[in-house]
């Protein structure tokens, strides 16, 4: 049986925590590591779509009107042909389900239940699994499906979480994010208990941290560890791998470049957020296999930078074409 994609929803019911930034850069990093990645832009702002050149099989770039007519939210309420919603980007291993701020939510007026009644779709818990069923069509094509969801507690968010294998939550470096993350965990519990899913929570981490050595951050980290254990049945789920702030991150967004591209295109050392994201995915969450670190070197990332973060030595031969990871 062919291996199917691992799907991860980047979710937090609170906006402004960097969910879209993390999901886009995470998908890009995994693609640089040689994984086949699908980035599902389910955030109605469509910011990740704006970061990418979205093209069809003929190489034609999609317009905003093209994306409007697609209306990705149709896959949330019933069966669709997923081939009509997946497009290539300028990156070899990265495809996207595009979205745009002008796309109207298919639920429109009325409640979620009323819309399902109009569509003549299944009643009961099964109605939350339309996206899960649709993604089953294409799981074998990819290694990872990264989903950027909406920052809210609504049925769109529930359907997104119901479709994934794991949830990962970025949080702002303040004390106002514990409850929103708890809400995310409650949605996971709903999906597992009511929909008979088996969704795991990878945990939450602090994003956009200015100074990891500052006393205020150390106090904040201690508070999050304590609150995490208090609210999550002692499990904690706090991932002590902060993503640090970097002024260059703002520049990369303005120029519509992912972090690793910005560093490579400007011939600078890996930005702190690049190092932290690599550390999060390789060291902490183990989503990147050691053998795939070689692909980063082939994609222009310095082997010395990779070794500093991961502890893995990447041997590069003299012609710099063949690489392999060493212990």
Model-derived features with residue positions:
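P-loop NTP-binding core
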Residues: 1-327
């Amino acid at each position: 049986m062919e291996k199917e994609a691992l799907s991860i929803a980047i979710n937090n019911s609170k906006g402004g925590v960097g969910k879209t930034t993390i999901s886009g850069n995470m998908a890009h990093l995994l693609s640089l590591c040689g994984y086949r990645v699908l980035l599902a832009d389910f955030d109605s702002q469509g910011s990740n779509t704006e970061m990418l050149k979205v093209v069809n099989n003929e190489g034609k770039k999609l317009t905003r009107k093209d994306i409007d007519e697609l209306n990705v939210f149709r896959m949330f309420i019933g069966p669709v042909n997923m081939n009509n919603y997946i497009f290539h980007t300028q990156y070899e291993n990265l495809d996207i389900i595009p979205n745009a701020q002008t796309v109207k939510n298919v639920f429109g007026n009325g409640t979620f239940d009323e819309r399902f009644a109009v569509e003549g779709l299944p009643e009961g818990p099964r109605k939350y699994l339309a996206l899960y069923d649709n993604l089953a069509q294409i799981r074998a094509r990819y290694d990872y499906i990264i989903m950027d969801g909406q920052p809210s507690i609504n049925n769109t968010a529930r359907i997104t979480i119901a479709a994934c294998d794991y949830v990962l939550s970025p949080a702002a470096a303040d004390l106002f994010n514990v409850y929103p993350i708890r809400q995310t965990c409650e949605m996971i519990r709903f999906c597992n208990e009511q929909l008979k899913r088996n969704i795991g929570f990878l945990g939450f981490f602090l994003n956009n941290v200015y100074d990891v050595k500052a006393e205020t951050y150390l106090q904040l980290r201690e508070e999050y560890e304590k609150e995490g254990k208090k609210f999550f049945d002692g499990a904690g789920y706090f991932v002590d791998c902060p993503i640090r702030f970097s002024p260059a991150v703002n520049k990369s967004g303005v120029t519509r470049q992912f972090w690793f591209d910005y560093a490579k295109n400007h011939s600078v050392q890996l930005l702190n957020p690049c190092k932290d994201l690599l550390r999060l995915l390789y060291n902490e969450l183990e989503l990147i296999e050691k053998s795939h670190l070689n692909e980063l070197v082939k994609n222009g990332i310095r082997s010395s930078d990779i070794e500093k973060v991961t502890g893995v030595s990447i041997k590069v031969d003299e012609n710099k074409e063949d690489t392999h990871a060493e212990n």
